[in-house]
Design a protein with these regions (language model features):
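ATP/Mg2+-dependent ligation/transfer catalytic cores
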Residues: 1-150
Length: 150
């Protein structure tokens, strides 16, 4: 957290996107002035649970996954993911791990099951502990993106 604070001062970042991945793979999150970095790093930010499902609604107009009456999730930034955006030097971004609201009746402050990055981290840690191996994955570039002669 301290290193990121120093980097924010050095680079002149004045706004940070606190981001996470939705269940559809979309990057979503909340923008907060960089002056609040230390506080957000310790306490987190709150956002509606439905944001993990892109705030989509079903055909009846109800949020998918969580009702409008639900509490808000808590996002805690992962400082090692912080970087300054190359196309707008005033802005930084950091990925976050999501947790259930601290005031929930069931599992307060627990891991949020709709947090894709958090789930992957937990599953990978279990896998490493059980098998003493690392999961690795890669992408297969689609060759149809390329056209002969270009």
């Amino acid at each position: 957290v301290k290193q990121v604070s120093e980097k924010i001062k050095e680079t002149g970042v004045d706004y940070i996107y606190f981001q996470f991945i939705s269940v559809t793979g979309r990057i979503v999150g909340k923008g907060i002035p960089a002056a609040h970095w230390v506080c957000i790093s310790e306490k987190g930010f709150q956002l509606v649970y439905g944001s993990t499902a892109n705030l989509y609604v079903d055909r009846h107009g109800d949020y998918i996954g969580y009702g409008a009456e639900s509490s808000e999730l808590v996002g805690i930034p992962d400082p090692e993911t912080f970087c300054q955006l190359p196309w707008d030097k005033r802005i930084g971004r950091v990925f976050c791990t999501l947790f259930r609201n601290r005031e929930e009746q069931v599992n307060p402050g627990g891991a949020l099951t709709s947090d894709c990055r958090g789930n992957l981290r937990r599953i990978h840690n279990e896998f490493q502990g059980k098998h003493d191996l690392n999961m690795r994955c890669g992408t297969e570039p689609e060759m149809m993106w390329l056209k002969r002669g270009e």
